[in-house]
Amino acid sequence: YEIAQCLVGSEMCIRDRDTNTGNIIVGTIGQSKLIEQAGIDISALKNKKQAFMLAVSEDGKLVVAGSDSHGTAYGILEISRLLGVSPWEWWADVTPEKKETFRLSGKFRELQSPSVEYRGIFINDEDWGLMPWSNKTYEPSDVKGEIGPRTNERIFELLLRLRANTYWPAMHECTLPFFLTKGNREAAKKYGIFMGASHCEPMACNAAGEWKIRGKGAYDYVNNSPAVYQFWENRVKEVAGQEILYTLGMRGVHDGKMQGAKTVEEQKAVLNRVFVDQRGLLEKYVNKDVTQVPQVFIPYKEVLDIYHAGLQVPEDVTLMWCDDNYGYIRHFPTAEERARKGGNGVYYHVSYWGRPHDHLWLSTMSPSLIYQQMKQAYDQGIQKMWILNVGDIKPAEYQIELFMDMAWNLDKVSFEGVTAHLKHWLERELGTSCAKTILPVMQEHYRLAHIRKPEFMGNTREEEKNPVYRVVKDLPWSEREINERLNAYSELSETVEKAASKVPADRQSAYFELVKYPVQAATQMNRKLLYAQLARHDKEDWEKSDAAYDSIAALTQHYNSLENGKWNRMMDFKPRKLPVFNRVERNAATAPMTADRKAACQWNGAEAKKGNAIVCEGLGYEGKAAEIRKGDALTFSFGNLKTDSVEVDIRLLPNHPVHGDKLRFSVSLDGAEPEVIAYETKGRSEEWKENVLRNQAIRKIVLPVTGKKSHQLVIKALDEGVILDQVMLYEVN
């Protein structure tokens, strides 16, 4: 059965080969007589978008009814899910298990509809993965950088299997733009995919790739607006009739500031003019009632400052808020923004190229963090559009599915929790026996990477003026901390190696792609850089670091050879060829290693003796962070100490304010006057960069201690969004 057929047809009847009698009826309400005659109540589908119903009729037929063409497609693919077929059947080689029979109760009835209207992915930073794989391996082309319709149809099928509907195509200069590639537009139409574009691609124009081909002069709306206007106009005319979510506004040709306007006020004036002109094009070529054309404005990076300076975005345009590229959403809508007709969206990253350091390789974003931030986003009214920057798709398979499952049915994911969601995913992909062993492995893998991502292990930074930031150097960890981390990774790697025997033969490639490569590559990356750190201090052999580098290369070579070379060129362990990915240069330390410091007491946020801690499942350095609601407090108790003062280290998630621009808490010891502490960061400040790399915001305060036998440390949230990870108590000599 052709998946795309249910997006262009109105009804069908799947027949038994032997009896030629239909036992599955598929159709869209209002367009299908078969559905109307099936004898099931479909009233619940009316006035819903993208919804479907599966029900067994009185005569024993399975009826698949969609509220529209998308709903019908999702309904068909729900049968596939019920049969145990993974959405990653092709993309991660999860071979379907053959079944002779499949039974449903005569009372079976399933109704589903999305939590978020537009749900999709952004292919980005494709230079070292998806583009060369598509262009040279899967869909060989003589046209440099072409990602063609054969590749995109595979992506579109995956989106439908994930119950997604929106696509932002790859847009780097290395890639031939989507709309300039023959067959791509038609493929999107065939699969019913809404085409969108990123923050620097207004009016469906990939400025980075297209301006040099189709533009004239500078991409500057102050000094060259006629040429830029014509550039946009040509595209809008070309794609008439295509389902497009138009991005409004303007930045630089790629991920940079607007040209021609220097101050925020000047940029605001240009954007006001841009809005008028862009919406005029939509009125002229798409719909005279421009409010009926889906449009989105994305205040990303410096554009958020322009928005906060009073930029007026048309009421019907969706406002799409962004994370800071490392998983923490920068702005949640105000009550006024939530009330807008256009609604609110979010653009979220599990892959990123940029300051302070890329994370393009292993996709280790904590599922618990994704859940916490996206649940908060939904609760704060971000319910119109969710887009995930997925890099090359692989190896972000699990994060993508978690994100899409939340966008489809947030209540279900919220009810079962992240641990259960991951467990069910592993069971489907690898089988129950293997999943039982691998679940704690993947949880620990994500926890260790939350502390510090594999790409950050060289203590380097990118896109800084001072070249010293690119030199691999010691992390501020003691020898004990390093050895504990090495041991933890060794246990993971050994378990993964042994568990392979529990995986069916036809799922071995899936196991390598989804578990073995990410876990063992992360293990070897940590070994490479931590053994090098120890070797700089004459505490280990350099050969161990070199051996780890060789292991990463061998693992990657094996990945690219899987399934007779199906994935050749997809995996590159040196994206952007950054220093951290190289063999570590041998040199001696010029400063002593960080000394070990033992805390007199330490707690995780969830370990408070008193208070209304909202435990964030699996989140934080030890997976026990806790949110403190505004006005609530947590109390930590400790006994007498032989000191007259203590240093309290409060370690929090480095998230951003939920309401307003403040993120504050207070600290009080034994009923003393509370000390108010703020920890919000601004832009890409030095503190924000440090917070990103260590995944904690840290505040330290010294407090006097009386001679009491027991003490009470109280931490109170003064704003929404305070998430306490750890508290460390040190005696002050």
PLM features: residue spans?
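Hydrophobic or amphipathic alpha-helical targeting/insertion segments
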Residues: G60-V94, L180-A204, K216-N234
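Structured mid-domain segments that build the active-site/substrate or prosthetic-cofactor binding neighborhood
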Residues: N165-W168, T175-F178, G183, W321-G327, ...
